[in-house]
Amino acid sequence: MTEAAAQPHALPADAPDIAPERDLLSKFDGLIAERQKLLDSGVTDPFAIVMEQVKSPTEAVIRGKDTILLGTYNYMGMTFDPDVIAAGKEALEKFGSGTNGSRMLNGTFHDHMEVEQALRDFYGTTGAIVFSTGYMANLGIISTLAGKGEYVILDADSHASIYDGCQQGNAEIVRFRHNSVEDLDKRLGRLPKEPAKLVVLEGVYSMLGDIAPLKEMVAVAKKHGAMVLVDEAHSMGFFGPNGRGVYEAQGLEGQIDFVVGTFSKSVGTVGGFVVSNHPKFEAVRLACRPYIFTASLPPSVVATATTSIRKLMTAHEKRERLWSNARALHGGLKAMGFRLGTETCDSAIVAVMLEDQEQAAMMWQALLDGGLYVNMARPPATPAGTFLLRCSICAEHTPAQIQTVLGMFQAAGRAVGVIG
């Protein structure tokens, strides 16, 4: 990699000669100033990190230094699995580098059919539709299901892709307080009974790593005659007896109308999907704009996904290692005095809560300098006034790496003044 290519894109100091009232980018002046203030403090830009080399699911080279990865969503560590890599290479040789078309035209290859069958087998459903990204899966299915005159009822802390799907579909949007069964019941009860309704939930919420009380929420939704969609992006592979997600872990098989997921986390590649047992589910392909009007995934990508999904069906040891690592990290950080996003280890996400952006940036920088990469998160990705470092644990982290990580957090926390 050349030195120039390794540098993140810089914002120009001087704006083009356009009158401010006609400059479409002037709305971002506050954001630009805030970013510059952060960089002027001497902190590396936390939102422009370059992986110069990736050595394994848990190690990379960043800024010329060997770094433990604790912020990649690579929960099951499938990115370097030999069988997964071999499947991608074979498809690349057999079908070429891309499809040059949408799924509705020439963009469905043998491996697209194979990955959708793998999803049906994994989830035990009759239907599966693959999208080019997880974001597009939510954007596509929500905007297609719920339109004008219909209602989408969603958690206030829902992912941006869920909100964008609501807006694209032009449905009425009703928000309820995060993880509040009572507020969900109240909001649904106030709506007219006649229009169709879709309740959108997430198994694991990606910022704090907390899980939804799906059992109670699904019961409320069904009481009010609403259909239910659950996004299991951050739980696929290691929640429930078959790794299907939080809904399976809470005994809700057969009660969820649509399950959304992604390939970019536990599966270890890129893409998104929706699975369902609804008898009319295939009609989504004929009406879903984000499915129809975009190029399909390259054959090598869906081939790797197929192999990974089938291996995840029996990845019992990996699941146990992931949960063991998550409990060790959560428990260790809590014992040191860090304030965490959840009281108990609820998922493979551990959020370290901090006072403000300055403290979060200093802590993040201290960890990076010590050889550890985590995600720094701030509004609007987090709730207003919430600043945190998000740790995503991997099944391939060794016990020794987890202990090293705990030592890094202790040293950085003391240096910054987060812990005593």
Curated annotation (Swiss-Prot):
It comes from the Bacteria. InterPro entries: Aminotrans_II_pyridoxalP_BS (IPR001917), Aminotransferase_I/II_large (IPR004839), AON_synthase_class-II (IPR050087), PyrdxlP-dep_Trfase (IPR015424), PyrdxlP-dep_Trfase_major (IPR015421), PyrdxlP-dep_Trfase_small (IPR015422). Its main location: cytoplasm. It catalyses: L-serine + hexadecanoyl-CoA + H(+) = 3-oxosphinganine + CO2 + CoA. It is found in: Cytoplasm. Keywords: Acyltransferase, Cytoplasm, Lipid metabolism, Pyridoxal phosphate, Transferase. This is Serine palmitoyltransferase. It comes from Sphingomonas paucimobilis (Pseudomonas paucimobilis).
